[in-house]
């Protein structure tokens, strides 16, 4: 190769390497921010929950981690419940029920809708306040959308992800 062709070859290879490195770094930054949200007051985000009825045992979960004390309203379901918890928030009936399972059977206990708790009922969903990390069971037979809305007067920072298993 002549000197000029060699110089152009090295320049082209250098630009290719620089472009690849920049693309990889951009993808890394994009992946790091996946599922992280900051909502201003009144803003909302929609998360799609897909049904996997063709699977024998399918399961959908909403993983929510709040990083501040702002209030978020979760809507789009008739009822809400956390994994590992016996408390069910029924939006349709506007009731909170604790299910107590013992060797004698199952007992249901109605709980008051206390707005000082970390989770309470609203007319069309539940409100989550304070720093919290919870996993909500969101399995349904048909696909639907969960809406997360900032109902506070300050910005809300959180991570939310729907996992379909």
Where are these regions (language model features)?
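Acidic, Ser/Thr/Pro
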Residues: 2-165
């Amino acid at each position: 190769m002549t000197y000029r062709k060699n110089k152009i070859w090295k320049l082209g290879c250098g630009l290719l390497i620089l472009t690849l490195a920049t693309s990889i770094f951009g993808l890394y930054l994009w992946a790091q921010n996946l599922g992280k949200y900051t909502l201003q007051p009144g803003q909302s985000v929609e998360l799609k929950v897909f049904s996997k009825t063709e699977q024998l045992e399918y399961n959908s979960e909403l993983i929510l981690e709040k990083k501040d004390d702002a209030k978020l309203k979760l809507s789009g379901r008739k009822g809400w419940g956390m994994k590992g918890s016996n408390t069910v928030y029924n939006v349709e009936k506007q009731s909170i029920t604790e299910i107590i399972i013992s060797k004698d059977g199952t007992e249901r206990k109605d709980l008051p809708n206390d707005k000082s708790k970390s989770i309470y009922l609203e007319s069309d969903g539940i409100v989550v306040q304070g720093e919290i990390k919870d996993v909500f069971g969101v399995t349904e037979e048909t696909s639907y959308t969960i809406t997360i809305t900032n109902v506070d007067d300050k910005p809300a920072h959180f991570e939310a992800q729907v996992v379909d298993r």
